[in-house]
Amino acid sequence: MAPDVAPPVTAPPVTGEVPREAPRDLAALHGTEQTRTYPCNSCGAELHFDIKLQKLACAHCGAVHDLSVDLTQSAVEQDLRTALEALQNGRLHGQRSISAEHKEIVCQNCGGHSTFSGSLTAERCPYCATPIQRDDVHNAPDRLAVDGVVPFQIDAKSATSVIDEWINSRRFAPTEFKTYNRTGSFSSVYTAYFTYDADTEATYTGRRGDDYTVTVGSGDDERTETRTNWFPVSGVVTNSFDDITVFANDGFDRARVAKLEPWPTQTAKSYSPEFVAGHLCRTYDNDVEQCMGEATTKMEAEIDQTIRRDIGGDRQDVDSRIIDWRKMTYKHLLLPIWLLTVIYQDKPFQVYINGVTGEVQGARPWSKVKIIAAAVIILVVIIVLIVLLKSRKS
């Protein structure tokens, strides 16, 4: 079976961009043979993670290599308090941090950070479609290590079909948007997420309200009113949370990215660079401490619901609650997104595809010319119909 080679839009990418034309020589951006992470045993060219085969494949000679990692090994949870102490005390170096062998691209236009290993073959920033310059490449700083990855399941051909269908269904989209393969950047990108686990015990005080009805008034003014008896309550409730996900990147439409959920985080494999070979990885912009607030907000909302269920009755009024957080762990995961970025009238428009489920979310520009043309056509049709009706009456 021929390997699935990620096809590029504007450039020949073995790094995740989707090709529409024959690859060009990008030797200026390539590392030496010694810096290549996974050279092919057959020809020496660089291997990439083939999404369709779920193996390492060579786009040059077609050779396929099994992954060296244990595919049955799941991502391991890490102690949250230990990570917070390391971040606060600046002790990431020498701890569980991303290897210094990684290189990092920092886009000069949008500030987006991406990491890669071995050779870089992407020509455009996946987030704003700005051409990548050699000065954009730096050594990656120390960051919390990646614990797991959910590999791409939607390959380049399928992703292209999905995005074409989505774009073609957008009426009044400008031609520049529909010809994204010439004007945009379409890339396979692993985005950064933190997942949080915790066991909680919440002690609360409050009031329980039981409704009852009474009849008041007389005659024509007789009516039924609902009243409430309130009783003081207190109690203890427990909750267990698993994989509360928080998106750790900036520069995306977070509301649209949230609609790509749910993610099958339970299928996350223990991280190995083999899974991301040939694809870009977005490093986190917000660390595990900065993302924790969003996670605890989600958990507290569920705890409040648990308290209200425990109080019972028709109405609940919570006066106080004290939460004891236990067994707090996290995972730093890479989750797969096909990212289309098209610049239209100097504004970037992004479309996202969940690389596992194929769910599509995105923003599209509107063509004023097409809208005006459609309005004119409708107006002409209305005028013609009016003229025909008048001619029939006469």
Predicted regions and their residues:
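Low-complexity, intrinsically disordered extramembrane tails and loops of integral membrane proteins
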Residues: 1-36, 64-98, 137-140, 267-276, ...
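Residues immediately within or flanking Cys/His clusters that coordinate Zn2+
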Residues: 35-37, 55, 100-104, 122
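Short cysteine-rich clusters marking metal-coordination/redox-active sites
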Residues: 40-43, 58-61, 107-110, 125-128
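Cys/His-rich microdomains that often coordinate metals
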Residues: 47, 65, 114, 132
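Charged, low-complexity helical/coil segments in non-catalytic cytosolic or luminal regions
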Residues: 99, 142-343
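Extended, hydrophilic extramembrane loops/domains of integral membrane proteins
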Residues: 335-361
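Juxtamembrane boundary at the C-terminal end of a transmembrane helix
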Residues: 384-394
